[in-house]
């Protein structure tokens, strides 16, 4: 290991993998990636096998194993948050669902002063650069065809998927061929980061192919304990590996630790709310009260049904069948283990006052919780549902100068009347769809929440008890102009306001969370950041039309 690098990237997760690969494309750049977790070994079935996605969570070999402080509006429940502590970060342990969000998300990002380069037209070319979309035709102007992230469409060929899509139509919605294309609104097959029966993590797609370069070095099990400074200029980092402390210098340091670790390290380094830092004996370096604030996440629940016909994937949870399923995957990369099973779903508006979808549905032809707890039924299916734009906000604060002490954080789920109202709408919409005739041949009755949950108050009480994080923490170091006191990162450079040689590139800089899973937007931001950091001309914006309710015909872009 050298004593000095041009760039040190803290975190070998989703954003860090993109940055390590792209920045080291310039042979003149010496790049060091520091990852606190271990490597994502190619033989590790719990990472590489798509259907094993439920097993890394809660396992210290893969997961930081975070949890919130008691959520004040969920009867004091602590909500567990799995975050990838392994090369590839959360892209090595997530559900592999690829969703860009709605184009209007980026139109809203671009509205504040200084944010105009973040509209959909400016983001679209970076989405396309990262994608290799096997489910799109070569002339599809919305999708990329030559990027490192290989995407499988569907296939959603289990009969329960088609019945669910048809039920959505019967409930008054539409089918869409591609939720990442012209029209997000509607029901249809999803893209997943699965190729040839194997997970496509950011590290597998970006970092591993680049690691043969002499100017890129990746250190795993390297826990960064502090940033080093001369005044307000970052000069390098100190990290611990195998019990030994190392200090390395850099022209620039890039934080890509994610929405929990990046604000934590900033606060440990004296960058945050001055009063809070002083209370812990940390001398403030710069007062940035937005560090750790504006914290957003998606909360979700499972609406589960028993299935009357033996067509669900429920038998695959039988431990007696797992060895055969595993051998099918090991020797052929096929069978039940070769899919994440989140092969379809939909996006809808919960009422006519909403301009674009505010509810997301993931459909599963199986009834099982994310922790592996299966429903009491021989066969079953479920939808994961939750509001996408909750106006509840949380915060993250370190509670010690010790970098190994986990920070306190809370999301304040269900803290506003608007949030609660959307939750009631979400459950009613889900029940309406699941109660349609298209599902009658399979519908063996609701398991969860169950028929005893009917009134608005009962629904909210159930969400308090049963809601889980969708694992989309974001916005804790949000970007915005320096004139915005609560912004942390400059939107044109990703540099931390008031600091030199320090940038943040990960989910924490999102100004608002997007509609859907957030891994794709994080990759997009990292692709764009890499061009900015390298001094390259940004990709030209692509101004193409996309579906907007009330502007286009209600059936525009749909399929039968």
Curated annotation (Swiss-Prot):
Catalyzed chemical reaction(s): choline + A = betaine aldehyde + AH2; betaine aldehyde + NAD(+) + H2O = glycine betaine + NADH + 2 H(+)
Annotated positions binding FAD: 6-35
EC number of this enzyme: 1.1.99.1, 1.2.1.8
Catalytic residues identified in the record: 472
Enzymatic class: oxidoreductase
HAMAP family: Choline_dehydrogen
UniProt-recorded name of the protein: Oxygen-dependent choline dehydrogenase
Source organism phylogeny: Bacteria, Bacillati, Bacillota, Bacilli, Bacillales
